[in-house]
Swiss-Prot record:
Function: Required for the insertion and/or proper folding and/or complex formation of integral membrane proteins into the membrane. Involved in integration of membrane proteins that insert both dependently and independently of the Sec translocase complex, as well as at least some lipoproteins. Aids folding of multispanning membrane proteins.
Name the record gives this protein: Membrane protein insertase YidC
Topology of this chain in the membrane: Multi-pass membrane protein
GO BP, one annotated term: protein transport
Domain of life, source organism: Bacteria
TM helices/strands, residue ranges: 6-26, 348-368, 375-395, 442-462, 479-499, 519-539
Gene label: yidC
Signal peptide (from-to): none
Heme in keyword set: no
Length: 569
């Protein structure tokens, strides 16, 4: 009996420790020593067959042999030297979804605010996904590869000022012109759409030379490795690069692997996308399918990384022009929309190693939310559904615990009878359980069946942007963040204490003391967990207490009646 009680709590405590360890690793990652040079070529895997396409994608040798004015190339990937970004004229674009800032120095998107996503520092301000300041660098860059063609270091010209998507307009375009070089005129075009986080980035190339040209275009994200601001009290799911192809499916490219120079990912393909991910949000380049491309990811300097894609513009004859367009998705990881934007894009929502449980849990949560309009109520309904699904197992466990509670005095006498002879005492207890038809481990079932759901819901809360700033009631304004006043963890501890009172008392003094401090220890753990997870655990405990109390009352009542009948006879 003592063993099964101890194992029951040990299993749950171990689960909490695993989550705590994950939090520690994310919040305090091992630091990398300074490196004096950019890493060499990464290990590549499954390079694909895109080289058989009519228009070739530049490999390492081709791209590095192309002289570029105002830029450099390393192993075929356009890069920039680490350091401060140059600054030019600012152009701001506002739609119903985003507020963007484009700098004519490079024609980069230097800042992008998501108007429907509040900032963690101040929920009255929009969240800035892309930004460039002394503390953080995360920008979208693009350019062309070829003699005299503009790169992300070229100064473009455009009419500075503020642009806004007017009522009745479906899209707005911003055109930036590069200096004409040797008869080649290039225009970079940004197209913003109403009701969408997709931004089309295009290059129009007009060739007035006497010979044909065959340029390539590149599109990349540049960012540092710092985790998103405001994630101190919760675990970021992942911060780093990611890539998807139909052949290799979804693959993360961790910054640590880029530091070591051993990142492995498919390089050439004619499908897929590449992105930078962080908790709740992503920025992904989405070239159209059947277009040959080359993916790359690199460490540029201390705490600075890039991930991008090279695609061909095609051969442009004299007097002709060509256009290449690659959409950029920069926005929240909204699961209901990502799959329709690009194949595999919904895989960026990562529920950890229990995705097989986490995905159905989120689907069920979303269903309940569509009925109630409140994510907190949806969590309560989810808890009740899970409890109902596991009712037979829980009932069996609580019946076992109730029977153990009845025979606790006999077990105590067995312990006293055998004294310090633990081997004989253990054998006597096993014989006793067999005689009484009691499974000493049966009481573990209520906890065991909840552990996978508990861990899965933990990752659902930390990975689903739909639950970011989702309020419940009263002081709970963000179910994905810890309870700011620790009310739910304290109530959770009280409920655990009450549940403990219904359980068989421990006969071993040391285990008894351990069991007494368990509610307090778990309450401290729950201080750091999302309020939604604590709400789930609290409701589950309340339902468990009600179920356990009812079963215990029935069994004890039945035992009392049996005892009376024996005495009467």
């Amino acid at each position: 009996m003592d063993t099964q009680r101890f194992v029951l709590f040990l299993i749950f405590a171990t689960s909490l420790l695993f989550l705590w360890d994950a939090w520690q690793k994310e919040q305090y990652p091992a630091t990398q020593g300074p490196k004096t040079a950019v890493q060499g070529t990464e290990t590549q895997a499954n390079t694909g067959t895109a080289g058989t396409a009519e228009t070739p994608v530049p490999g390492d040798q081709l791209a590095s042999s192309v002289p570029q004015r105002g830029s450099t190339a390393e192993n075929g990937a356009p890069v920039r030297a680490a350091g401060k970004l140059e600054s030019g004229d600012k152009i701001t674009i506002k739609t119903d979804m985003v507020l963007a800032e484009i700098d004519t120095a490079g024609g980069d998107i230097r800042r992008l605010e998501l108007l429907h996503q509040p900032s963690k520092e101040d929920k009255n301000k929009p969240f800035a996904l892309l930004e460039s300041d002394p503390e953080r660098v995360y920008i979208a860059q693009s350019g062309l590869i070829g003699e005299g063609l503009p790169t992300h270091k070229t100064r473009f010209t455009a009419e500075p000022g503020a642009y806004e998507l007017a009522a009745g307009q479906d899209k707005i375009q911003i055109r930036l012109s590069a200096p004409e070089v040797d008869g080649v005129q290039v225009t970079k075009i940004y197209t913003f759409h109403r009701g969408s986080y997709l931004i089309d980035v295009s290059f129009e190339v007009a060739n007035q030379r006497n010979a044909a040209i065959q340029p390539f275009s590149y599109f990349q994200m540049l960012r540092d490795s710092r985790p998103p601001v405001g994630s101190f009290f919760m675990v970021p799911t992942y911060t780093g690069a990611a890539l998807y192809t139909e052949e290799e499916k979804f693959r993360k490219i961790e910054f640590s692997a880029l530091d070591k120079g051993n990142a492995s990912y498919p390089k050439n393909a004619d499908n897929g996308w590449i992105a930078m991910l962080q908790q709740y949000f992503l920025a992904a380049w989405l070239p159209k399918d059947k277009l040959p491309r080359e993916y790359y990811a690199k460490r540029l300097g201390e705490n600075e990384y890039t991930a991008g894609v090279i695609v061909p513009v095609g051969q442009i004859e004299p007097g002709s022009s060509a256009t290449v367009t690659v959409p950029l998705y920069a926005g929240p990881e909204e699961q209901s929309k990502l799959a329709s934007i690009a194949p595999g894009l919904d895989l960026v929502v990562d529920y950890g190693w229990l995705t097989v449980i986490g995905a159905p849990l989120f689907w069920l949560l979303s269903l309940f939310h569509s009925w109630t309009g409140n994510w907190g109520v949806a969590i309560i309904l989810l808890t009740m559904s899970v409890k109902l699904a596991f009712f037979p197992l829980s009932a069996a466990g609580y019946r076992s615990m109730a029977k153990l509670r009845l025979v606790t005095p006999k077990l105590q006498r067995l312990r006293e009878q055998h004294g310090n002879d633990r081997q004989r005492m253990h054998q006597a207890m096993m014989d006793f359980y067999k005689t009484e038809k009691i499974n000493p481990m049966g009481g573990c079932l209520p906890i065991l069946v909840q552990i996978p759901v508990f861990i899965s819901l933990y990752w659902v809360l930390l990975s689903s942007v739909e639950l970011r700033y989702a309020s419940f009631a009263l002081w709970i304004e963000d179910l994905s963040a810890p309870d700011p006043y620790y009310v739910l963890p304290v109530i959770m501890g009280i409920s655990m204490f009450l549940q403990q009172r219904l359980s068989p008392p421990a006969t071993d003094p040391i285990q008894a003391r351990v069991m007494q401090i368990m509610p307090l220890a778990f309450s401290v753990f729950f201080f750091f967990f999302p309020a939604g997870l604590v709400l789930y655990s609290l409701v589950n405990n309340v339902l468990s207490i009600a179920q356990q109390w009812q079963i215990t009352r029935m069994i004890e009542g039945s035992a009392a009646n049996t005892s009376k009948q024996k005495k009467a006879n």
